[in-house]
A protein has these predicted regions:
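Segments of small-molecule ligand-sensing domains
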Residues: 78-89, 100-174
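Extracellular/periplasmic periplasmic-binding protein-like sensory domains
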Residues: 17-96, 191
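Hydrophobic alpha-helical
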Residues: 1-20, 95-102
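Conserved C-terminal helix/tail region of periplasmic/extracytoplasmic solute-binding proteins
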Residues: 120, 125-133, 164-209
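Active-site proximal loops enriched in glycine and acidic residues that flank catalytic Cys/His/Asp
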Residues: 5, 29-33, 53, 164-166, ...
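Catalytic-loop motifs flanking and including active-site residues across diverse enzymes
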Residues: 6-9, 63, 91-99, 158, ...
């Protein structure tokens, strides 16, 4: 069974599986069906449920340890300490890190220390180059894969891992799986071409990238 739900849809499905005796080991969720709110209320009843994971979780990464040490241990945390390092918390950290790195990347081209415009930050977002060495230096070891973005590729990565709920926390697998771009790229191109045509947009040229 593939869960494609959002919010309470997932925990409801897992509770029904428990009630009917359907093996949770045979249930797989898309990445947005694989966070703590989806399984926490079901607890042991969701044990064995699998879900795709775009990012790691847990309190082991250095970036998470720094937040615990410099924020929560000093009594300056504004949210529950036990949520630090959860799937959604970590995803939020990644988003903020990418935003900062986009500004940093833009400043490399347009002037270090200067205030960047929206267009300049867009260039930074479209020219990210985060290799493993950089991710480790930022404290995001084992959190995400290296990524490189471009004007034509805003995603930068099409890889994910599979995580399994053990009744209390997520156990993430070591193997990464890549989406089949031979299937996805034509679909993305067709969708973007239609959107551009419907909205009467002009295609960006290389100079704008």
């Amino acid at each position: 069974v593939l869960l494609w739900g959002w919010g309470v849809m997932n925990s409801t499905a897992l509770k029904e599986a428990q009630a009917t005796g359907f093996p949770r080991e045979k249930m797989y969720g898309v990445w947005w069906a694989g966070a703590e709110p989806d399984v926490r209320d079901v607890g042991e009843g969701a044990k064995g449920y699998h879900a795709l994971a775009l990012n790691g979780s847990g309190q082991q990464p250095k970036a998470i340890q720094d937040i615990l040490k410099h924020v929560h241990d000093k009594g300056q945390g504004t949210g529950p300490k036990d949520e630090v390092g959860s799937v959604l918390y970590t995803r939020g950290m990644i988003i903020q890190m990418l935003s900062v790195e986009a500004v940093r990347r833009a400043q490399e081209r347009f002037g270090k220390g200067k205030v960047m415009t929206g267009e300049q930050v867009r260039w930074g977002l479209e020219n990210l180059a985060l290799d493993q060495k950089k991710l480790d230096a930022l404290g995001f070891n084992n959190v995400m894969r290296p990524l490189s973005t471009s004007c034509a590729d805003h995603m930068g990565s099409t890889w994910a891992r599979v995580q399994t709920w053990n009744g209390k926390t997520w156990d993430i697998g070591a193997d990464w799986y890549q989406a089949d771009e031979q299937i996805l790229k034509p679909m993305i191109k067709a969708g973007s071409e239609k959107y551009m045509s419907d909205k009467k947009l002009t295609r960006r040229d290389a100079a704008d990238c």
